[in-house]
Amino acid sequence: MRNVLAMSLLAIFLGGCASAPASRDISGVWINQAAIDEAAKGGKLREALLANGPNLEWAIDSQTAKANYTNGFEWVEGKLMPENSGVWQVSFYGSPSTDLSLSGNQLIQVASDDDPRQSFMRSTVNLASDAPLGTHFEHALKSAYLGGQWRVISGKGQGNQVTFLADGQVKGLPGANAYALCLAGDCASMSGEFDSLWLQEDELGAAHIFVRKGRQLEIFQALDSAKPDEMPQLYPGKREWLLEKQL
């Protein structure tokens, strides 16, 4: 009986030891949940991203020593070095390395000369394993920022129920069946201080300026003040829709 008990305790102990390294494996997709939570408060989108960014998602594979991230407009490929005293170093071609560590259930990107300290959570979004880098963050952001039911208060389709889906579809908004939020890059440069999104119906689409204030979402035509040979500089024109989020 004592031998059986001893063997059982040994098995439990060894099992615990064997599983310990798995808890230190940072493989997987990590998203900037802090940026999403800030955006979900219903204010300016890019302000929330900039305040908690700049990086939005990490995709890490310790087996292949790959660690890639996106900041919303570029994908950066890195090489993951073995853990050293709780720190994983990621090296990049032509750029300074970045250090990562774990703090509880968070992946921490250590502050550097180029970037502030950032925290990331494992993505719970269910997507295909080959989903493009950044897709997990975008799905989670769209659900948090534009999820739920909206009602057209004014504009074409007044009274319609509008739904923005996480995969980029929009239902109930006349003249559009797909949308994309501008997170960073050229679209952000073109819209300057304003938040913008792309609305599309089948093959035809256009940029729009939007203003989010709590439960209200205003969508405006995007007018261009730039000269023909300059990068577009968008600003809000006529308001096309006023939407209100339903409780």
Residue ranges, per PLM feature:
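Hydrophobic, ordered structural segments
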Residues: 97-121
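Contiguous, well-ordered beta-strand patches that form the walls/edges
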Residues: 36-44, 50-106, 154-160, 170-247
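N-terminal helix-cap/turn-to-beta initiation motif at the start of protein domains
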Residues: 17-31, 131-151
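Bacterial N-terminal signal peptides
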Residues: 6-15
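Positively charged n-region of N-terminal signal peptides that target proteins for export
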Residues: 1-4
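Edge beta-strand at a domain terminus
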Residues: 112-147, 178-179, 224-247
